[in-house]
Amino acid sequence: MMKISYENKELIRHIQDICWRINQYTDYVAFYHFSGHVNGFDIRVCKSKEDYNNRIYAKELYMNLFEDDELYNELSEILETLQGYENGSKEVQVSETSI
């Protein structure tokens, strides 16, 4: 298994935290699933807690596929996107990517 830098671990913690905050403080619902056996995770943001099958953002990331600096950039982009949903500055649109 790949060793993850401290900076990237912190970004992962922030991503988990912001998913929790999205669920607590917005009308959206966020899902964060970690799969330790493949060192990957899946994040989804859905339109509302009642309409939790209507995805507006989805990202799947396998950390072993990236060098440390590339992983940092990917995690930073995810965090920035999630912050947009938390702050209400993201428009409701489907943005689905998979790596």
Regions inferred by a protein language model and the residue ranges of each:
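Negatively charged, low-complexity tracts enriched in Asp/Glu with abundant Ser/Thr
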Residues: 1-40, 49-99
